């Protein structure tokens, strides 16, 4: 590969990693498993080591991952919070320790390490002055983090005052905030019942819970913390041992991992690694590896730091959470819109600390593409806490009696015909609300927080109401009475009254929420908002044609067809009429006149990078108010790309396609003119 090719490869990796960092640390929405991120990062490091002429100051390898959010006040750390370098193999660990020994003044000594589990949470820095907690911050970019003082105080195990009579004048205590596995599962289960957002994994749950503008939300989440080190410390003599410093933190009142161990040399570290790897599934918290730190503080100081990490410590990462097992059967689940989803039933296997016996097969196109058959030995992956999926088949282990997976002709719940359109990957039950599975999912959607928000109407209660024939349609919910509800198992009069109150409260809504609650195929929150802004009431929407609907932002031919089909069904209109008769109502929105002469009217606009004057959602709202269509990707149909700082691949693609680029200053002039 020539220099130009190498440079392009490096730039591609840098752009990928920046994107991954932004989604992981800022949005708390990881795009790829940790193993894939680590591979990209390591590939970039290797390129830069081999071709140092292409190493640039803006490379992700030259900084600590993470960016302080605009939503929180910045806090500077007195001593930087650097990331750790990663090792993945025994040879890499040996090389790391060898480099450390060679840099020390007495290279022949046997190194002693403090070994700790690497918790998969959010790193924080807590500052105590005169023994009192004065402020707390996230790691951020290593030098400056986000002020989360009010939120960290909601964690009961964080001492507000150090439990010693002679505290340091100032001390920074570093720790990892996490959510225990059991609490995470319980939180997500309840969120699903209430129709609220669930978290992909405990790390995201901890980060999302701690980075809340409202501390009451943080207080409602099951956050915990283990402390792992000390940053700056003034007017206090600290022990010359990391392990002794951890004991000191315990005396101060902090929680320290009980799995911390002392190890000598490479063999001691590897023994600890194997010990924690074997124990990983039994731990009450998620870990993705172990951390080794040279125990002597004076040796740590001799070794110092490289640009983004200490030379005296590293993280030894565990393998990605994939396992082999046998696929023994396939069942089919029916969703709200009739989608029939194949689910693999597996011989139970432990993956990432959870026993997995089911995994999604997504759809029949995926089954065909991966050539998955009943009886196959398959690799399943559980990345974070997303639904486990079948990744691939071990073909050499395929038995002679492996069977093809066939699409059922009839719905496994109601017996109605299952059809699959030629251009769709998804097969559907045509039973509609006659199908109990669809009715249950429809009611769950109708009652969810972003729809009618009927608090207390969760999946367990919905199952009871449908299975016992108490409700047959959405409108039946608003005709429930106290006696019927109170007589249900585990309900009682108080719970029944609360549900009736929630039903009454939900009657006052908005037109866009009501439309979203109806569950029209292809119509999400954004589409419902567009329809509500344009039509204002059911009668005018019922009369809309496909051609007319397609002129609206975010409404394409498929969505338009589903809308017209929905309002052409007599039973849908009957349910809507009943809902309105039973008191569902909304204020009539004021018609906003859009100046059609503004440069954004009718244009497709893409936002990329970071705007210094407003957040992404605010910019999007301004564009929508001006009649623009805001898209998430650049194509030949894009009219403008609004580029903030650190704009990446979208800006590159826009330049390649010749799309007009608008800088922030120009954008502000246009939206404010």
Swiss-Prot record:
- What protein name applies here? DNA ligase
Q: Tell me which InterPro entries the record gives.
A: BRCT_dom, BRCT_dom_sf, DisA/LigA_HHH, DNA_ligase, DNA_ligase_AS, DNA_ligase_CS, DNAligase_adenylation, DNAligase_N
- UniProt cross-references to SUPFAM superfamilies, sorted A to Z: BRCT domain, DNA ligase/mRNA capping enzyme, catalytic domain, Nucleic acid-binding proteins, RuvA domain 2-like
Kindly give the Gene3D superfamilies that the UniProt entry links to this protein: 5' to 3' exonuclease, C-terminal subdomain (1.10.150.20), 6.20.10.30, BRCT domain (3.40.50.10190), DNA ligase/mRNA capping enzyme (3.30.470.30), Helix hairpin bin (1.10.287.610), Nucleic acid-binding proteins (2.40.50.140)
Binding annotation for Zn(2+): 411, 414, 429, 435
Required co-factor(s) are:
Mg(2+); Mn(2+)
Residues that bind NAD(+), according to the entry? 34-38, 83-84, 116, 139, 176, 293, 317
Q: Name one GO cellular component term.
A: cytosol
Q: Point out the gene that encodes the protein.
A: ligA
Q: What is the species of this protein?
A: Legionella pneumophila subsp. pneumophila (strain Philadelphia 1 / ATCC 33152 / DSM 7513)
Q: What's this chain's function?
A: DNA ligase that catalyzes the formation of phosphodiester linkages between 5'-phosphoryl and 3'-hydroxyl groups in double-stranded DNA using NAD as a coenzyme and as the energy source for the reaction. It is essential for DNA replication and repair of damaged DNA.
Q: Which PROSITE patterns match?
A: BRCT, DNA_LIGASE_N1, DNA_LIGASE_N2
């Amino acid at each position: 590969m020539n220099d130009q090719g190498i440079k392009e490869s490096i730039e591609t990796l840098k752009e990928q990693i920046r994107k991954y960092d932004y989604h992981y640390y800022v949005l708390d929405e990881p795009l790829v498993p940790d193993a894939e991120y680590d591979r990209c990062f390591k590939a970039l490091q290797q390129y830069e080591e081999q071709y140092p002429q292409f190493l640039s100051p803006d490379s992700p390898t030259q900084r600590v991952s993470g960016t302080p959010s605009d939503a929180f006040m910045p806090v500077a750390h007195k001593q930087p919070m650097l990331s750790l370098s990663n090792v993945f193999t025994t040879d890499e660990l040996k090389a790391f320790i060898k480099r450390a020994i060679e840099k020390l003044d007495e290279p022949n000594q046997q190194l002693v390490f403090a070994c700790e589990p690497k918790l998969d949470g959010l790193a924080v820095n807590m500052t105590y002055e005169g023994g009192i907690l004065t402020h707390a911050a996230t790691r951020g970019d290593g030098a400056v983090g986000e002020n989360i003082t009010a939120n960290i105080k909601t964690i009961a195990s964080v001492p507000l005052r150090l439990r010693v009579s002679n505290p340091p004048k100032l001390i920074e205590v570093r720790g990892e905030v996490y959510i225990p596995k059991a609490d995470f599962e319980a939180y997500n289960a309840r969120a699903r019942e209430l129709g609220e957002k669930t978290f992909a994994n405990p790390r995201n749950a901890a980060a999302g819970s701690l980075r809340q503008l409202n501390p009451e939300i943080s207080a409602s989440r099951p956050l915990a913390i283990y402390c792992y080190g000390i940053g700056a410390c003034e007017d206090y003599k600290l022990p010359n041992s990391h392990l002794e410093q951890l004991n000191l933190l315990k005396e101060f009142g902090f929680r320290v991992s009980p799995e911390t161990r002392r190890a000598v040399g490479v063999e001691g570290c590897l023994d600890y690694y194997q010990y924690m790897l074997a124990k990983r599934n039994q731990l009450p918290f998620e870990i993705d590896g172990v951390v080794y730190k040279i125990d002597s503080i004076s040796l740590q100081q001799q070794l110092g730091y490289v640009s983004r990490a200490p030379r005296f410590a590293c993280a030894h990462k565990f393998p990605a959470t994939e396992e082999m097992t046998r696929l023994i059967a396939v069942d089919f689940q029916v969703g709200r819109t009739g989608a029939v989803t194949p689910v693999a039933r597996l011989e139970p296997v432990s993956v990432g600390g959870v026993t997995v016996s089911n995994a999604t097969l997504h759809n029949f196109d995926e089954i065909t593409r991966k050539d998955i058959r009943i009886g196959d030995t398959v690799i399943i992956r559980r990345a974070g806490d997303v639904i486990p999926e079948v990744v691939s088949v071990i073909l050499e282990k395929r038995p002679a009696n492996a069977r093809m997976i066939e699409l059922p002709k009839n719905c496994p719940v109601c017996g109605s015909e299952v059809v699959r359109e030629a251009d769709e990957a998804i097969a559907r039950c045509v039973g509609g609300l006659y199908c109990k599975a669809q009715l249950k999912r429809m009611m769950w959607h109708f009652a969810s927080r972003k729809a009618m928000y009927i608090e207390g109407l969760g999946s367990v209660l919905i199952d009871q109401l449908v299975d016992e024939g108490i409700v047959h349609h959405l409108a039946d919910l608003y005709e429930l009475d106290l006696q019927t509800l109170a007589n249900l198992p585990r309900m009682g009069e108080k719970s029944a009254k609360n549900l009736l109150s929630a039903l009454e409260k939900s009657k006052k809504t908005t037109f866009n929420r009501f439309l979203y609650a109806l569950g029209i195929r292809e119509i999400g929150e954004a589409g419902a908002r567009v329809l509500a802004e344009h039509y204002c009431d059911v009668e005018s929407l019922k009369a809309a044609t496909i051609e007319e609907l397609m002129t609206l932002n975010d409404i394409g031919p498929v969505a338009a067809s589903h809308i017209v089909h929905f309002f052409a069904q007599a039973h849908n209109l009957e349910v809507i009429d009943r809902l309105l008769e039973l008191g569902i109502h909304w204020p009539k929105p004021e018609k906003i006149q859009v100046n059609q002469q503004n440069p954004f009217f009718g244009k497709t606009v893409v936002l990329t990078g970071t705007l210094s004057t407003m957040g992404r959602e605010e910019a999007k709202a301004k564009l929508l108010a001006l009649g623009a269509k805001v898209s998430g990707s650049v194509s030949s149909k894009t009219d403008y790309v609004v580029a903030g700082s650190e704009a990446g691949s979208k800006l590159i693609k826009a330049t390649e396609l010749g799309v007009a680029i608008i800088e922030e200053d120009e954008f502000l002039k246009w939206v404010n003119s």
